[in-house]
Amino acid sequence: MNLPIADLHCDLLSFLAKVPKADPFDPDQIACAFPWLKAGGVRAQVMAIYTDVHPESMELASQQADIFVQLLEDHPETVCRWDGAFQQHLESTEQLGIIASIENAAGIGTATATWKEIYAQFDALLEKVGSLAYISLTHHTENRFGGGNYTEGIGLKEDGKRLLDYLAGKRIPIDLSHTSDLLAEGILTYIDRHHLPIPVLASHSNFRSIWNHKRNLTDEFAQEIIHRNGILGVNFLRAFLDNEQPERLFEHLIYGSKLNEQGIAFGADFFYTQDFPDPSRHPIYFPLA
């Protein structure tokens, strides 16, 4: 029996926002094109609003939120909102359920944005997309909120604490997939110390015990997420699985299942790779994935 698949992370929105002549229906352009998702049995997909740390990040995030809404309006035969009604009628529809997320809070607030502007940006994004699957404070690098996964010695900053305060009670999980270890520790400590009702997950991360990479979760953080009833999305990128062994994907899935079989998921992280600058990273994905 083929079970419906829900995937916790793809970068279709940033692809549509930044790549000329981007087409979500062209399987030759991106691995999360709609035909690929349908062929793979994906019935529900989280679509990240991804931005890097740039002065124009807030504008780019708003553009991607508009694209998310436009997909729903222009292609109702293909996509619908991933909500309770969709899940209830999953077996009777051919549509793909979609929900947005925010990958890097630089899209909520750039380095020079005032807090009035940050709150307004967050509220506007949430109003546009309707709901958010999760928010990550950082990506690879540092921003005003904290340290990304490739930073050293940078944890949760004061602005990060203030943003967590604003998220409290909104039922939007915080994502640890792109945090430094120090930032992950800071987020968890701050949530506990101030009794903030914020769920925690890792949308597209693997396990450092299987493959030693800074983008992967330590056992400590993986177990902490499970302890908080969060979920772990296994990432399909070769760099985070194993440089040589495609079957390592299965090891990450099995390892996560042993932590909690109800808490493991896919977080494939399919993005536009045709302009990826580092030749050592190719192939980005094993054919197995």
Indicate where each model-derived feature is located.
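Aromatic-anchored, glycine/proline-accented short structural segments
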Residues: 187-221, 225-228
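N-terminal hydrophobic targeting/anchoring segments and the immediately downstream early-domain regions
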Residues: 1-156, 161-162, 169, 212-229, ...
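Short, glycine/acidic-enriched loop or turn micro-motifs at the edges of active sites
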Residues: 10-12, 178-181, 207, 272
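Loop-centered beta-sheet repeat module
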Residues: 152-189, 194, 200-205
